[in-house]
Amino acid sequence: MAKNITDVSRDDLSKVSDEELQKCSKEELLRRLRKVDAEKMNLMLEHGNMMKDVNRRLQLHLHEIRSLKEVNQKLQEDNQELRELCCFLDDDRQKGKKLSREWQRFGRYTASVMWKEVGVFQQKLKELESNQDSVMRENLELKEIIIMLDDERNGAGSRSSIDSQSSLSNLNGGSATVRDVGDGSSTSSTGSAGSPDHHHSHIHKPTEGKITSIRRSMDDLSTNHLLRNIPNGLNDSSSNYIRQLETKVRILEDDNKQLLSQQGSVGDLKTLRKGLSLYHSESQLSSLSQFQDTLQNGSIRIAGGDLAPTVTGYLPAAQKPEAVVHAMKVLEVHENLDRKIPEDYEEDLSEKEKAIVREMCNVVWRKLGDAAGTKPSIRQHLSGNQFKGPL
């Protein structure tokens, strides 16, 4: 029976009932008790070791947790700093983007303004170039006109007065006395003293409106005479302007002729010498050049048939050629310049203007002499009227 209890204790004492334990002896129970205590102590030691190991591991884990917390805290701080830095950089990026957009708008605006300014300046440059070209052309034309006028003035000044003297001496049959042209004086014969100007000495003075119209017509006639000498190298605008002036001159000449016919005689010009003395010469040039052109074309026919002088040595004014009538006017102007001018006329003509009128009269006589050399009818009129022009 004791063997059975021993076998049971070996397996498990907890499974042994109390009755069986009561049946065991004391020595067996003590032995089992000590054995159980020893096992218990071993278990407690193992448990303590295990607890120490667990505590040690727990401490290690705690240290790891603490270190991880510290690392996590540092990482959080770094993350916060990075966030702040990202926010700052994002603000800078937004500011830079906004600034870049503003600069782009400003650049587009400045570029458009610059393009507009460049276009305006290019247009102005083109206008300036065109104006420069027109000014250069006008300067060239003016240079040509000035050179032509200088050549004409030099040619007119270099002409010898002996040519006109010889031509007029031949016309008058050598009976006229020779006088110098340079003194600016002129002699009138008895024929001029008995000219139609003296037959109409009691004619009323024209009205102020007629004087103004004649003065304007004479100004245009003088302008026309200067424009006739302009060379053909000018542009179309200048030639059109010249043609318009010539048309205006022809209209004014017709009006002037009608006004002169209404006055009744050539002697009316004597009453206008105060206002028109400076314009007679250039009007004679224009009228005489037209008469010379018609003489060259052979289209002039003297009215009245015969050219024989009348008892007094003159033909009626309607039967005289236009050149002879104008020559009488020029001679009258030349004679009036040599006379003593009244006090109310002293301010009208200066010495320079008198010299210009004398020079124009000389030119008219020279042209008249050239025309008379080609047409015998003019020579007969000049010799019949016994004109003595400046020599």
UniProtKB/Swiss-Prot annotation:
Region (Disordered): 154-212
Coiled coil feature spans: 23-87, 121-146
Keyword hit for Coiled coil: yes
Subcellular location: Cell junction, Tight junction; Cell junction, Adherens junction
Pfam families, sorted: CCDC85 (PF10226)
Superkingdom of origin: Eukaryota
Biased composition (Low complexity): 158-175, 183-195
Keywords associated with the record: Cell junction, Coiled coil, Developmental protein, Tight junction
GO cellular component: a single term: apical junction complex
Physiological role: May play a role in cell-cell adhesion and epithelium development through its interaction with proteins of the beta-catenin family. May play an important role in cortical development, especially in the maintenance of radial glia.
Family named by the database record: Belongs to the CCDC85 family.
Name of the protein in question: Coiled-coil domain-containing protein 85C-A
Natural source organism: Danio rerio
Gene name for this UniProt entry: ccdc85ca
